[in-house]
Amino acid sequence: MSTIPSEIINWTILNEIISMDDDDSDFSKGLIIQFIDQAQTTFAQMQRQLDGEKNLTELDNLGHFLKGSSAALGLQRIAWVCERIQNLGRKMEHFFPNKTELVNTLSDKSIINGINIDEDDEEIKIQVDDKDENSIYLILIAKALNQSRLEFKLARIELSKYYNTNL
């Protein structure tokens, strides 16, 4: 398993998109707003899978989808967590780090000042069958989903600062 990037945003990637703005940030800002809507919808779909069907293939697909769109915008920590969800859905990984370890990798920890990093956590109380070999993967995906929500919140803070508006 690769290590999570220390920067929330890869500005080299995002600046390529921003360069298309031509003195008007509406283009790049519009892409970010679309991503925000897309991410919230995808998080909800993942949660429904964890609460309902518990389909690892669908969770893999959702993780892959969000990994691609977040990576394209340079939102590299979200992309990293979504890749873990994808790999857990494929049973290619068997571990997910705890939240404190991941938060401690941030290059600028001041972004978390005043934020309750556990505020939006869904309880990791998904109903699993102890005899189901997929149970551990579902529990780890639930843990990763909570982390992706935190990374999403941190990315929104950074992007809101850049665009000087609440995104």
UniProtKB/Swiss-Prot annotation:
One of its GO terms (molecular function) is protein histidine kinase binding. Residues 24-129 form the HPt domain. Keywords: Cytoplasm, Nucleus, Phosphoprotein, Two-component regulatory system. Present with 6330 molecules/cell in log phase SD medium. GO terms for biological process: osmosensory signaling via phosphorelay pathway; phosphorelay signal transduction system. This is Phosphorelay intermediate protein YPD1. Changing residue 90 to A: Reduces phosphoryl transfer rate. It holds the Pfam family Hpt. Transmembrane segments: none annotated. The phosphorelay mechanism involves the sequential transfer of a phosphate group from 'His-576' (H1) to 'Asp-1144' (D1) of SLN1, then to His-64 (H2) of YPD1 and finally to 'Asp-554' (D2) of SSK1 or 'Asp-427' (D2) of SKN7. Interacts with the response regulatory domains of SLN1 and SSK1. Changing residue 64 to Q: Loss of function. Belongs to the YPD1 family. Gene3D superfamilies: HPT domain (1.20.120.160). InterPro entries: AHP1-5/YPD1, HPT_dom_sf, Sig_transdc_His_kin_Hpt_dom. Phosphorelay intermediate protein that is part of the branched SLN1-YPD1-SKN7/SSK1 two-component regulatory system, which controls activity of the HOG1 pathway and gene expression in response to changes in the osmolarity of the extracellular environment. Catalyzes the phosphoryl group transfer from the membrane-bound osmosensing histidine kinase SLN1 to two distinct response regulator proteins, SSK1 in the cytoplasm, and transcription factor SKN7 in the nucleus. Changing residue 67 to A: Reduces binding of the 4-aspartylphosphate of SLN1. The modification Phosphohistidine is found at residue 64. It is found in: Cytoplasm; Nucleus. One of its GO terms (cellular component) is cytoplasm.
